[in-house]
Amino acid sequence: MKSNTPTEDSTKWMLESVEIDSMGESSSKEPEINLNKNEGGLKKNASRNLGVGSIIRTLSVSNWRKSGNLGSPSTRKSGNLGPPTNAVPKKTGPQRVERTTSSAARGLQSLRFLDRTVTGRERDAWRSIENRFNQFSVDGKLPKEKFGVCIGMGDTMEFAAEVYEALGRRRQIETENGIDKEQLKLFWEDMIKKDLDCRLQIFFDMCDKNGDGKLTEEEVKEVIVLSASANRLGNLKKNAAAYASLIMEELDPDHKGYIEMWQLEILLTGMVTNADTEKMKKSQTLTRAMIPERYRTPMSKYVSVTAELMHENWKKLWVLALWAIINVYLFMWKYEEFMRNPLYNITGRCVCAAKGAAETLKLNMALILVPVCRKTLTILRSTFLNRVVPFDDNINFHKVIAYMIAFQALLHTALHIFCNYPRLSSCSYDVFLTYAGAALGNTQPSYLGLMLTSVSITGVLMIFFMGFSFTLAMHYFRRNIVKLPKPFNVLAGFNAFWYAHHLLVLAYILLIIHGYYLIIEKPWYQKTTWMYLAVPMLFYASERLFSRLLQEHSHRVNVIKAIVYSGNVLALYVTKPPGFKYKSGMYMFVKCPDLSKFEWHPFSITSAPGDDYLSVHIRALGDWTTELRSRFAKTCEPTQAAAKPKPNSLMRMETRAAGVNPHIEESQVLFPKIFIKGPYGAPAQNYQKFDILLLVGLGIGATPFISILKDMLNHLKPGIPRSGQKYEGSVGGESIGGDSVSGGGGKKFPQRAYFFWVTREQASFDWFKGVMDDIAEYDKTHVIEMHNYLTSMYEAGDARSALIAMVQKLQHAKNGVDIVSESRIRTHFARPNWRKVFSELSSKHEACRIGVFYCGSPTLVRPLKELCQEFSLESSTRFTFHKENF
């Protein structure tokens, strides 16, 4: 900010603080910054078009005082900090920044050289460092390349090496041949000092390698490259020169060719505010104040927690209770029936328990097919039954029944082999003839004879097929966590699970044979196995076979566009079959006959229901997905934009058929054939019944929620036509015609949606960059808040990410573009503080129903569920948790 008066020309301004949203920033928000000049009350609202250089100079030089240890070489020697003395009127000698207590606290939190976990445990950490020193030192000297490993910065060796050099220059220690333990202790003490100036001095010494107190553009670039490498930000590293130029442009308005240390310090101390901590404490206090009296004693809280669990899971409870009651009833009915059977006098209770287990086994072998009739369940989700039946837990119920089947089958088999058969074959002939002769004939069988009957053989084979299929369906096998040696490695992974499950067809055939050819002869109408299985098997077979034949004919789709992203992700845009109606959050199955004629794989639909195309984003994790990505990569060519990349752009390969080639059918010879079937219901499709949405996606787990965001965004865009009319939408950033969903009809939508996307790769943000930019542009009322988190980066305040945070702030303020995601949505470092997120939502949306939808790694399921329960109990807001299951 410049002025025509001499007094104002000589005034330097300092950024006291920049308010940062504790959960994340939406680029559509304009931060409000208070500017105080001298003792005047000048206040201005900083918008995106406010120059960053003018923001830097927001406080007058009257806030400087003596002492310190930063600045020019002369000020360093004298132990003082400040700008050149000629920049401060009416002052003599070097000066230092006047920091308020809150400002110092913010700066202290905003510059750490070690992980936050070390704070408060410095003594324990030093003992570990001593042990590592003894391990890695050579002749009592620790070499530079082992310094990072020794102090706990082993994953950022280059950055640790620069810290090593800076600490050596600071202590005037010759470090070329390594350092001893005493010198290492001095380095360690400097790094953990609570003195803000000491930490800043180390950081500045890293930047200012020649020690002249001035940073040139080349030195700034080197530190940006170093920080980008430490945080695994390849694209930022490529553009380091541009970002160094940006810093020089904003901090060196007079084009001196350098910036001074005090200018960099001003910007660094303004990056983080303590408002987050205050806000969290305030929200927690308010939340605790809202706790009803009945929750405040241990017993009352236990009762309340139990009641809350029952309220949250009442659908599951009544279904499981009904299922358990039926199982117990059938077991006891058959048990009592055989207590009156003559065989009871020979085998005792063994035959009763075996027959009871067999009866419940028939029931469960029939029921286990119901949860996997996906098409039927999808239809039922839209009926009144969805209010009382937990369709979202179909896979979990399927697993529970499977465990029960395994138990009942083993119990039934063990009782026959180890109890019934030995007693029947070893009892006296007279006893056998008296009690078993009428059922088994006059010839007493041997144990081997009983084992070689058709009943025993089919039973053992059935156990083998079921055991094999169940084992490969376990989490460790299905997710390929178990690493088997060759050639047994083919038994782990999704393909093994999928094909092994088809062996259960043989198990069902054997079950029917096993239940019909009994050792104890009965009339056909008393053989009930086929009665249990007939309807479920016919129903399941018709859904799998007949509907598949029809769907493959009508659901052969044409590829509109395929995009191969870095990060092993393939985005497919295909034609939408006539009559293919779905809701946001649903998924569909995809098959590529060129790869496998029998494999179908589920993927969330990422297009909105109103689009006239279908899209899925597929991450290459297994053999099938990897080969599919490879096939499409061969047909993809770099686009013109990718051939000449713009600054901050991510490289991608794509190919298009629609819009470029009007003969789309002819162009399909380039691509592998694609078939789809669906759509199928998923928990996220019920998002509309909640007041507020909290959508949490980890990595590729964001896909179910992209369709929801697109659908909501379509209702926010101005001038959206009614259903049936065309509008120009976007597909992966490219313009393509589509149908919009109707904005009328009284369709209920949530009031707000908070989307938290947590990923560990910078390239992931390119998958949905177009959606993020559309939200920033069209969501003027802030209905959708996006919070992107990159876990590969060190959290805000770490020295390894401090300069990146500064560049990010400058770039976003100047151009409205985030340097990490390269979209208009701001990216946060490390992981979200979920307790803070829930605390703020509960205080912000009192007495609202918040739907928490999660898709990603199982590690986060339990913490999110516990937070939902905790804050539902302790506030008037009710959180309902849903997890995506395929």
From Swiss-Prot:
Q: What residues does the EF-hand domain cover?
A: 195-230, 239-274
Extract the Gene3D superfamilies matched here: EF-hand, Nucleotide-binding domain of ferredoxin-NADP reductase (FNR) module, Translation factors
Q: Which GO terms describe its molecular function?
A: calcium ion binding; oxidoreductase activity, acting on NAD(P)H, oxygen as acceptor; peroxidase activity
What residues does Ca(2+) bind to?
D208, N210, D212, K214, E219
Record's Gene Ontology CC terms?
A: membrane
- Give me the ranges of the annotated region EF-hand-like 2: 171-183
Q: How does it sit in the membrane?
A: Multi-pass membrane protein
Indicate the transmembrane segments per the record. 317-337, 405-421, 457-477, 500-520, 529-546, 689-709
- Domain Ferric oxidoreductase, residue spans: 355-512
Task: Give the FAD-binding FR-type domain ranges.
Answer: 552-686
Q: Which UniProt keywords apply?
A: Calcium, FAD, Flavoprotein, Membrane, Metal-binding, NADP, Oxidoreductase, Peroxidase, Phosphoprotein, Repeat, Transmembrane, Transmembrane helix
Q: Where is the composition biased (Polar residues)?
A: 64-78
Q: Is Phosphoprotein given among the entry's keywords?
A: yes
Q: Region Disordered: which residues? A: 1-46, 64-103
Instruction: Provide the function of this protein.
Output: Calcium-dependent NADPH oxidase that generates superoxide.
Similarity comment text for this entry: Belongs to the RBOH (TC 5.B.1.3) family.
Name this polypeptide is given? Putative respiratory burst oxidase homolog protein H
Provide the species name. Answer: Arabidopsis thaliana (Mouse-ear cress)
* Encoding gene per record: RBOHH
